Amino acid sequence: MQVILLDKVANLGSLGDQVNVKAGYARNFLVPQGKAVPATKKNIEFFEARRAELEAKLAEVLAAANARAEKINALETVTIASKAGDEGKLFGSIGTRDIADAVTAAGVEVAKSEVRLPNGVLRTTGEHEVSFQVHSEVFAKVIVNVVAE
């Protein structure tokens, strides 16, 4: 199924690209989320007429994401207290929700879906580097200091 992308989609393309995707992916994900429209003649003409407006909107979203990333980077360190054993091993773990709540409490609004933990949840005390994917192109990093209660 041919679609026109209205937003940058990972591993697919960017604004204005005409790509061929499976019908289910287009029908169930891209179109309902507003990331694409079917590539009909009417939609192609409509898109070309609104291209500048859509590019400006995309640039505005990117600028807002960069501003949020700067705020997150400015935090540098966030401390989370959790129960731990003698050897620094936590009872339980610290996941994306706990990190998002701690960063939000520090003053920057972050959704748990933006937290990236490449090595899985945090299970030990100490400092861990956590990255945030604020936008498909914008990343931020914070050091999470896990201390024992």
Swiss-Prot record:
Gene Ontology cellular component annotations, sorted alphabetically: cytoplasm; cytosol; cytosolic large ribosomal subunit
Name the domain of life.
Bacteria
Q: N6-succinyllysine is carried by which residues?
A: K71, K83, K112
Q: Which PROSITE patterns does this one have?
A: RIBOSOMAL_L9
Which GO BP terms, alphabetically?
A: cytoplasmic translation
- A GO molecular function held by the record: structural constituent of ribosome
Q: Name one Pfam family in it.
A: Ribosomal_L9_C
Q: PTM N6-acetyllysine: list the residues.
A: K89
- Report the HAMAP family cross-referenced here: Ribosomal_bL9
Q: What does this protein do?
A: One of the primary rRNA binding proteins, it binds very close to the 3' end of the 23S rRNA.
Q: Its family?
A: Belongs to the bacterial ribosomal protein bL9 family.
Summary of subunit composition and partner proteins: Part of the 50S ribosomal subunit. In stalled/collided disomes (pairs of ribosomes where the leading ribosome is stalled and a second ribosome has collided with it) bL9 in the collided ribosome contacts bS6 and uL2, while it contacts only helices of the 16S rRNA in the stalled ribosome; the inter-ribosome bridge thus formed is different from that formed between normally translating ribosomes.
Q: Which PANTHER family match?
A: 50S RIBOSOMAL PROTEIN L9
* Protein known as: Large ribosomal subunit protein bL9
Species, as recorded? Escherichia coli (strain K12)
What does UniProt list as this organism's lineage? Bacteria, Pseudomonadati, Pseudomonadota, Gammaproteobacteria, Enterobacterales
The gene that this protein is the product of is rplI
